[in-house]
């Protein structure tokens, strides 16, 4: 047993998802609907997880959030639309629905704790599918990993940061600034 309070809290947490039904990190309850996507997902328990193949936060409240990959600002130094790995403009939140983007496999790019994230898989399905992975109870600890979706030529189409921590990111903490203004 570890003397690390954070590691012990993670190991004691109730596991989420299963190998056949991973916990969807883009859904507040782990359900199938893609609600809110991100470039970084927080994991706070062992289990099986999945994330949709979406560019960053391009889905918000279950709808397309085009402001995540386009801009209403004009000028010579404005990238509009944002471009993908191949230099093509991003036209759709779902990676597979963009020109030259055909997901083929998911891989670990790096992790800062051994065996933090394992069993990484690309699962083909509607809208390009998803990536699933496991965070094992025996090796869970605070740490970070980057997982990528690649095409058949090993080009990275997009990547996501996975942060494993026992911190409750939904816990609202009131902060008071120097001017005595309170923020939640």
Identify the role of each PLM range.
Residues 141-152:
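A short beta-strand micro-motif common to beta-rich folds, especially ectodomain repeats
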Residues 1-116, 173-184:
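Solvent-exposed, low-complexity, repeat-rich "mucin-like" stalks and linkers
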Residues 44, 52-54, 134-136, 150, ...:
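A structural detector for beta-sheet-dominated domains
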Residues 153-160:
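Short, exposed coil/turn segments at beta-strand boundaries within extracellular/luminal domains
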Residues 161-171:
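Short beta-strand edge segments in extracellular beta-sheet folds
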Residues 126-142:
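Extracellular/luminal low-complexity segments enriched in Ser/Thr/Pro
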Residues 108-113, 118-124, 131-132:
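Ligand-binding face of N-terminal immunoglobulin V-set domains in extracellular IgSF glycoproteins
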């Amino acid at each position: 047993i570890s003397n690390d309070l954070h590691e012990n809290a993670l190991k004691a947490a109730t596991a989420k998802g299963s190998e056949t039904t991973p916990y969807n990190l883009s859904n507040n309850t782990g359900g199938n609907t893609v609600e809110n996507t991100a470039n970084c997902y927080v994991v706070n328990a062992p289990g099986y997880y999945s994330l949709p193949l979406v560019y960053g936060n391009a889905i918000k409240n279950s709808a397309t959030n085009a402001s995540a990959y386009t801009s209403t600002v004009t000028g010579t130094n404005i990238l509009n639309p944002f471009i993908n790995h191949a230099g093509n403009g991003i036209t759709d939140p779902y990676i597979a629905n963009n020109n030259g983007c055909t997901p083929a496999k998911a891989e670990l790019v790096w992790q800062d704790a051994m065996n933090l994230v394992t069993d990484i898989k690309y699962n083909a399905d509607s809208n390009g599918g998803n990536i699933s992975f496991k965070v094992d109870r025996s090796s869970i600890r605070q740490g970070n990993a980057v997982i990528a979706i690649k095409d058949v030529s090993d080009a990275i189409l997009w990547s996501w940061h996975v942060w494993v921590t026992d911190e409750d990111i939904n816990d609202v903490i009131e902060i008071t600034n120097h001017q005595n203004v309170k923020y939640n």
